[in-house]
Amino acid sequence: MDAGSDDGTGEAARSAGARVIVAPGSRAVAMTTGALLARGDALLFLHADTTLPAGAGDAVRQALEHGGGGAFRVRYDDGRPFLRTLGDLRLRFLGPVYGDQAIFVTRAAYDQIGGYRPLPIMEDYDFARRLRHTGRFFLLPLYVETAARRHRGHGTLSTLARMWTIQGLYRAGVSPDRLARMYPPTR
């Protein structure tokens, strides 16, 4: 699924033999479209700049034998010590997971919570929070690696402050449309 990226990701995927479906609009629309087109009983939502670790498939299958869904821990593709541990700190202090953690779910649980809501921002946070309320959420001990481009481009402290502010405002009921203007996409 490609939500309208302009960085050549879709073309790279095509040249590697992948079927690329473009779903213009928000990431939530792309993930919903992907889930509708998927034929399996398990769904894994992987961002284009995130890499799964060895053994990911087996770990997901084992977790999903118990139903529900889950996610991986995250590390950033940056050698700076603080960024290497930021994923664990983010998880510990912010709680719910985000899309760069390769969220996975059974189709039954996906349908039970109504899938992704068509939000312009916080769609992964919202999805994972609702999934956790089903009582069947697994945080795997394996790490995915994701791009730290926003941290490199805007600075880590600025990025963290913006993320925490947006999450706090979202939890306080501020409209996702308004929040999206504060956190432009990096594609």
Which residue ranges define each predicted feature?
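A conserved acidic beta->alpha catalytic loop
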Residues: 2-10, 50
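Acidic helix N-cap motif at the loop->helix transition within catalytic regions
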Residues: 7-16, 55
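Glycine-rich, basic loop-to-helix element that forms the pyrophosphate-binding segment
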Residues: 12, 22-38
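Short aromatic/hydrophobic "clamp" motif used to bind/position activated sugar donors
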Residues: 43
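Conserved donor NDP-sugar-binding/catalytic core segment of glycosyltransferases
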Residues: 54-81
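A recurrent flexible, glycine/aromatic-enriched loop bordering the glycosyltransferase active site
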Residues: 68-78, 87-108
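Acidic donor-binding loop at a coil-to-helix junction in glycosyltransferase catalytic cores
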Residues: 121-127
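Hydrophobic helical membrane-anchoring modules
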Residues: 129-187
